[in-house]
């Protein structure tokens, strides 16, 4: 009964807000408005938003609950906003759950743009690209090799590989952020469980609806209570690591990213007016790395497996490419990441998976920091902007046969520059270098060692789960990993 009342009240509130916005903005040339208030109920929101371009063009407004937002559905409009006019569009909105998850915004992913945010980004990027530059690839190689050995111990047995990939990517992030001592302390299962709990709770509809209909936070909400509890567990884990790192820190030396960042915040700020970075910024940088770097990469790896199960001819070509470069059965040989151009089809396959299933199909919302414009339309200050990255990747004016899995499109010079899988501009994903390294190493090792086979007669679905929040999750599936050289069928042969 309460839900019915809320659904009846929503159009009235939205209508009142619409009239107020119209009165304030009546003199501006705004993007066209897609009518309706229940767009969030669409099961596949990125594709639905792309479909609206047929009537309204690549940029339009719509109402998400009580919020008036502008949606960008093409590479041209996204790059105009996020690259050419990045300073106008670098802000973040401030919904309730962002405040909860980000500890009131000392955070890179969810924090608003400022000079302090810029200094925070610079420190975290340095920790990734300088602090662990020499250890990043060896750690990914070592943990991927251990993953393959675990899979080899159960040859041909159906495996829920999405969970295995999540454990692998979580291990990589934890090693690089906290150091290899976490393995001795047997903390990995606790870290993994905590991350899963935060992501699952945060993405639930009972949490998401509070961000678009803010007054609902005053009603009893068990989901919000669970989210707060999950965040407390998360913070306890990170604070424990901070304490241990501070106790053993040696000036001028660093073992991992947390060491590097702790020494960075101890230095006075070099940029005038930016303020001083604090331990809370190190805390939230670690959280961003853990949450942002676990499920996103694992999800992309899982989609790669699903696409290769549907396209065994591509899998066979990939294995032939690996055998040509490394020799058949050369499981201990490797292609260093700096020499990745030696495997053009593998790189093209990764690019195609990222095109069809971008890391985040709808980029986290941006907010205009001052009045601006896109494609000749006025965009007022404080407007929420949603870049539809998946929509841009399916734009028929840019991509030939956009809905088809066709890695060869990226073998043509210059095609890779058209993709926006990790975003662009000031808010581009900081973890992109690590994610690309992981995708390359894991898929290389996996296809060197195994042939991917369906677990039964039916192939896994290519349709994502409906009503996904941040990432496009696939339907649950299993795969058989048949060690190569054990008399398995070629992936190109019928079963």
Curated annotation (Swiss-Prot):
It catalyses: progesterone + reduced [NADPH--hemoprotein reductase] + O2 = 21-hydroxyprogesterone + oxidized [NADPH--hemoprotein reductase] + H2O + H(+); 17alpha-hydroxyprogesterone + reduced [NADPH--hemoprotein reductase] + O2 = 11-deoxycortisol + oxidized [NADPH--hemoprotein reductase] + H2O + H(+). Changing residue 173 to N: In AH3; simple virilizing form; 1-4% activity. Keywords: Congenital adrenal hyperplasia, Disease variant, Endoplasmic reticulum, Heme, Iron, Lipid metabolism, Lipid-binding, Membrane, Metal-binding, Microsome, Monooxygenase, Oxidoreductase, Steroid-binding, Steroidogenesis. InterPro entries: Cyt_P450, Cyt_P450_CS, Cyt_P450_E_grp-I, Cyt_P450_sf. It is a peripheral membrane protein. Changing residue 192 to H: In AH3; exhibits low enzymatic activity toward 17-hydroxyprogesterone and progesterone. Changing residue 357 to Q: In AH3; simple virilizing form; mild; 0.65% activity. It comes from the Eukaryota. Its cofactor is heme b. One of its GO terms (biological process) is glucocorticoid biosynthetic process. GO terms for molecular function: 17-hydroxyprogesterone 21-hydroxylase activity; heme binding; iron ion binding; progesterone 21-hydroxylase activity; steroid 21-monooxygenase activity; steroid binding; steroid hydroxylase activity. Changing residue 342 to W: In AH3; non-classic form; mild. Changing residue 203 to G: Decreased steroid 21-monooxygenase activity. 17alpha-hydroxyprogesterone binds at residue 234. It is linked to Adrenal hyperplasia 3: A form of congenital adrenal hyperplasia, a common recessive disease due to defective synthesis of cortisol. Congenital adrenal hyperplasia is characterized by androgen excess leading to ambiguous genitalia in affected females, rapid somatic growth during childhood in both sexes with premature closure of the epiphyses and short adult stature. This is Steroid 21-hydroxylase. It comes from Homo sapiens. The lineage of its organism: Eukaryota, Metazoa, Chordata, Craniata, Vertebrata. The gene is CYP21A2.
């Amino acid at each position: 009964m309460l839900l019915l009342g809320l659904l009846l009240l929503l159009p009235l509130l939205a209508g009142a807000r619409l009239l107020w916005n119209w009165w304030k903005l009546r003199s501006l040339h705004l993007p066209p408005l897609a009518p309706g208030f229940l767009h969030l109920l669409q099961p596949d929101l990125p594709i639905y938003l792309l479909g609206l371009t047929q009537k309204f063009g690549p940029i339009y407004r719509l109402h998400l609950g009580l919020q008036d937002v502008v949606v960008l559905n093409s590479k041209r409009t996204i790059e105009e906003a996020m690259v050419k006019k990045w300073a106008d569009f670098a802000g973040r909105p401030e919904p309730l759950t962002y405040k909860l998850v980000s500890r009131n915004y000392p955070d890179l992913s969810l924090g608003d743009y400022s000079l302090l945010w810029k200094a925070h980004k610079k420190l975290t990027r340095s920790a990734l690209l300088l602090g662990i530059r020499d250890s990043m690839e060896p750690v990914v190689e070592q943990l991927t090799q251990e993953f393959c050995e675990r899979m080899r111990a159960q040859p041909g047995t159906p495996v829920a590989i999405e969970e295995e990939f999540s454990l692998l990517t979580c291990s990589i992030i934890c090693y690089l952020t906290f150091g290899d001592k976490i393995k001795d302390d047997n903390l990995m299962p606790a870290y993994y469980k905590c991350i899963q709990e935060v992501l699952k709770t945060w993405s639930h509809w009972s949490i998401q609806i509070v961000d678009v209909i803010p007054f609902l936070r005053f009603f009893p909400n068990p989901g919000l209570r669970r989210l707060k509890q999950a965040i407390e567990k998360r913070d306890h884990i990170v604070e424990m690591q901070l304490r241990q790192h501070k106790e053993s820190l040696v000036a001028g030396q660093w073992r991992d990213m947390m060491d590097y960042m702790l020494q960075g915040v101890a230095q006075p700020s070099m940029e005038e007016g930016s303020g001083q970075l604090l331990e809370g910024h190190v805390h939230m940088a670690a959280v961003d790395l853990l949450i942002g770097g676990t499920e996103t990469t694992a999800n992309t790896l899982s989609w790669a497996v699903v696409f290769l199960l549907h396209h065994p001819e591509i899998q066979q070509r990939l294995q032939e490419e690996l055998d040509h470069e490394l020799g058949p059965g050369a499981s201990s040989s490797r292609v260093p990441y700096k020499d990745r151009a030696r495997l053009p089809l593998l790189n093209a396959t990764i690019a195609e998976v990222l095109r069809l299933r971008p890391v985040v199909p709808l980029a986290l919302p941006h907010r205009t920091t001052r009045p601006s414009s896109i494609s000749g339309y006025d965009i007022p200050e404080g407007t929420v902007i949603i870049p539809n990255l998946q929509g841009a990747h399916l734009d028929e004016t840019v991509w030939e046969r956009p809905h088809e899995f066709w890695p060869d499109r990226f073998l043509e010079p210059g095609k890779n520059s058209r993709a926006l899988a990790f975003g662009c501009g000031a808010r581009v994903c900081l973890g992109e270098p690590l994610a690309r390294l992981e995708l390359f190493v894991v898929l290389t090792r996996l296809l060197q060692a195994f042939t991917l086979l369906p677990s039964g007669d039916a192939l896994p679905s290519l349709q994502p789960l409906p009503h996904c929040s941040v990432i496009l999750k696939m339907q649950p599936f299993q795969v058989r990993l048949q060690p190569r050289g054990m008399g398995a069928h070629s992936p190109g042969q019928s079963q």
